[in-house]
Curated annotation (Swiss-Prot):
Protein name, per record: D-inositol 3-phosphate glycosyltransferase
Species annotation: Streptomyces griseus subsp. griseus (strain JCM 4626 / CBS 651.72 / NBRC 13350 / KCC S-0626 / ISP 5235)
Keyword presence, Metal-binding: yes
Any one GO MF annotation of this record: magnesium ion binding
Positions bound to UDP-N-acetyl-alpha-D-glucosamine: Q54, P55, G62, R282, K287, V348, E370, E378
A Pfam family assignment: Glycos_transf_1
Record's keyword annotation contains NADP: no
Catalytic activity of the protein: 1D-myo-inositol 3-phosphate + UDP-N-acetyl-alpha-D-glucosamine = 1D-myo-inositol 2-acetamido-2-deoxy-alpha-D-glucopyranoside 3-phosphate + UDP + H(+)
Amino acid sequence: MPRSRRTDEVSQYVSRLGSTRTAARLRFPGGFSGASRKPRRVAMLSVHTSPLHQPGTGDAGGMNVYIVELAKRLAAINIEVEIFTRATTGSLAPTVELAPGVLVRHVDAGPYEGLAKEELPAQLCAFTHGVMQAWAGQRPGYYDLVHSHYWLSGQVGWLAAQRWGVPLVHAMHTMAKVKNAALAEGDTPEPAARVIGETQIVNASDRLIANTAEEADELVRFYDADPAAVAVVHPGVNLDRFRPFPQGSDELRPGNAPSGRAAARARLGLPQDALIPLFAGRIQPLKAPDVLLRAVAVLLDRDPSLRSRIVVPVVGGPSGSGLAKPEGLQKLAARLGIADVVRFHPPVGQERLADWFRAASVLVMPSYSESFGLVAIEAQATGTPVVAAAVGGLPVAVRDGVGGFLVQGHEPEAYARALGRFADAPELVERMGAAAAAHAQSFGWDTAASATADVYTAALSDHRRRARAHHG
């Protein structure tokens, strides 16, 4: 299909936004040099989704967990965090203390309800106004640094950081060009306006935080990011919450994962001897829950005897663009002849989610794109292996053949083969689950917060150096 004139104009504009830079090797936290002073207080921006929202509902997902856990751990090392997010109901207090040292500030920007994420760019001016109003009531130098999450927040952070004279650290979480390169069937491409906005943010940021080395490479390759300004910080997992037994249990002993799984199944009303492949996440084409259902249909065609001992829970709610909704999946399950083994459940809180992970034989993540895939680490921390698409950050989160299996592509037959290995050798669940739990131990949020603080320190040091050079 020939490119439109409009597409060419956008491409030329994006090209002009990026400067030509010589390739340099990527430098990560620990490799930065500069003064050692870390910030006292950070303004964290999350325009489109509140850290108070339950993950798995609407646009709330892994990013919400990321912001909450990171902010708490930063506060624990004496970096105060104030999170600005859009108010979605009039009953919200202007400020909410999320934890000691962590404050959530609600900003009025557009109607409380009925505003899709795709409509939020029109409200960025109002959101920025609210952020500036909050800042105006503080003493000079109140915020040492701005840390924005997702491109909408990056646009606000760009202006705020310049106005306050502080550095901007940005985390993309997802990128338009990367998503558009791997669209699921029925999904809607990200608009050119987002590509332009992300390119602007890359050039405006003092530091960019990537979840994995692959994401860092994508920032350089797709957006011409300065490699020296990109830092890799792996997200973490709440190891107190996601463990083979609930927190406070007296059964937290090595080798007890099987009894932990049995206890979780009893709490959730699941059969003890069943193969339970779990999908947990937002129901949208990007996450590809339909691939799991199709794979189960293939598996049952090959081995009809499995029907009496398989349960497929789908835990999550609708989100984003495309056609994937719970009712759509229910109809698909009926067409595939597997409605009797698939169970749909609404999104649940983190404690309950941990129980679903414990109960599962395997977590299935057939996503088309994942910057990291927090739920993969969370499930493994509970002692549950993962079958995931070999995309984005999932090869970092999942060690292929050790704590689960990575699948190339999205063909249901390939996922059916992976699930069949667990059906044929049930002991694989416990063996891989133990390896998965050991792997997850290296992804604590304390480590992520410490590395993020190093990025902040480097950004502050460079910012001061440039300011001194500018003023002679």
